Amino acid sequence: MSSEIHSIIASNLKNAEKNCVPVGKISNEYPQLAIKDAYKIQLINIDKEVEEGNPIIGKKIGLTSEAVQNMLGVNQPDFGHLLKSMEVKNGAIKRISLLQPKVEGEIAFVLKNDISGPNATVEDVLEATDYVTAAIEIVDSRIENWNIGIIDTVADNASSGMYILGEKKIDPSKVDLKSVEMRLYMNNQLINSGKGEAVLGDPAYCVAWLANTLHEYGVTLKKGDVILSGALSAMVAAEAGQEFRASFTELGDVTLRFE
């Protein structure tokens, strides 16, 4: 696929975000696109953001549940980039600033050392992690009606939107991440729940997968990076006036309000 086509698709996605008007399914219009093309498209928009003063502060891992992988016909996760502008600081965001937001409860890793592939292990991840904490990711799609396949979501920065971290910082060696339980509430009503093992069996394994996959692109996970390790339960559509709380055993709570 030509770089010209990559640029056209990247521009269409960027305009969709800017104007809050989603585009049609990319993989329908360009059926010959491969996953490597999709990552190149993703990077075009990320590089532009960085050039404009919006730095990369971490990564997110998507498609970590077997059910979602089966739905999209893939057998591996994907990844996207977290930018400084994506972090929610005050616990509230404007619903109108997003297209089709959905909420997920996740375990976040914050690194104290770099992690390099291609042979990173769970042990390497735990040793390189400063702390783990509760997180809510707001996924969003620039593709109309969330009508996505693997190519579409990868090109669209793994359907990234925004995220918020909890305040409790836990040494990963002090908690069994696989057994951490999460309950997601909307307006104080329990919506769904999940455990750490829901993401490929172990959130730390997901981060190791990411480090090893990034090695193929010449990228290393860096000290200070925030890594969102994958949704512990199904994503939930969000609307103005709703407040979400993800409550984790060991890791505490994190709350987000849509205005």
Name each model-derived stretch.
Residues 2-201, 243, 253-259:
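Catalytic-core "active-site belt" of small-molecule-metabolizing enzymes
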